[in-house]
Amino acid sequence: MKLSKIALEAEANALAALFNGGFMDYFDGTQPPSADFSVSTQTLGVTLVFGNPAFKPAVGGVLTANALITGVVTREIKVAWARCYKADHQTALVDLTVGVADSADIIMPTTHLVPGLQVPVSRFSFSIQNWKGPLT
């Protein structure tokens, strides 16, 4: 299956709407296998808030976030991953890796977060890939 540009952008924009007024929480510890698994022993260090709308309209299946509200660290942690939620702050949407290397989904100058530190997001974007897998 190869989606048209209009179908790809409609898919991306539908996903983007789920983030409106949502949250991005930064945690320490082991990242769960997927966003369908509950947070258990991981410690929350900081929460950022998505705007409403959270993203600009998709272009070529690429979503670029509008400004997020900067979070202030509440607990000292070594951040390892983040989870994004809908506006209810209950419904998980996506988990992201956090690190100092380009291989991380979220790149930070340091993963050591201390109380009072402000955590901004300078840019947040991702691409909805045009699925080309085999049909069975």
Language model: regions and residue ranges:
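Small cysteine-rich, disulfide-bonded extracellular modules of the LU/uPAR three-finger superfamily
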Residues: 1-82, 87-136
